[in-house]
Amino acid sequence: GDILFDEEFAKKNKESITSARNLLADDLSVKVFDNILEFYKTGELSLLDGITTDKDEAFSLLSLGENETYVDLGAYNGDTVDEFLNYTNGKYKFITALEPNAKNYSKLQAHCSEMKNLELWQLGAYSHNTTLCFNNKAGRNSAIVNESNTKTPVAAVDTILCGRAATYVKADVEGADFETILGMKNTLKMFKPKLNFSAYHRFEDIFRLPLLISGIN
């Protein structure tokens, strides 16, 4: 985002930062949170030593089973569907995958053509159903921008699922994480799915995303 994470910003958001920190359930999570905030302020790379984890560790926390109803927001060419299947022994109940970029979506369709119990949408995820400008030249990092010749439809997860269950939601929505969560309030309340979201696109997401999710639940 355009925000500068400095002492003034930290002071202004102290209450929210403290509230988000208090939601964390273990010492390592608190250390990660504290070190990342300090890294944002100072840019000191050594603060990231000892707080990074590999994908296997992250997925061990998610503890995915063989009967998941998976929602993939930003499925690119199908690589994250494959990643999901890798951790569920290739088994699942249902997959809903969204990809806004036309070229990527064609690859996704081809990649998943033999799969059953799956639906694909050429859409981006957002807080509500609308049309937004996308920078589609960024490949897997296609993102919402203020001005572009490429208009892309986006939709709320709640609208797409229409009350159907979700047990695991992964989002790669390039900075629209807050809006995406707003668009899945009903899904979160009803099914409390496991979430795999990014909190690095905007400085403030590290505290505002946990607070938003906690407030909904």
Identify the residue ranges that each predicted region occupies.
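Phosphate/nucleotide-binding beta-alpha loop and adjacent structural elements of enzyme active sites
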Residues: 1-217
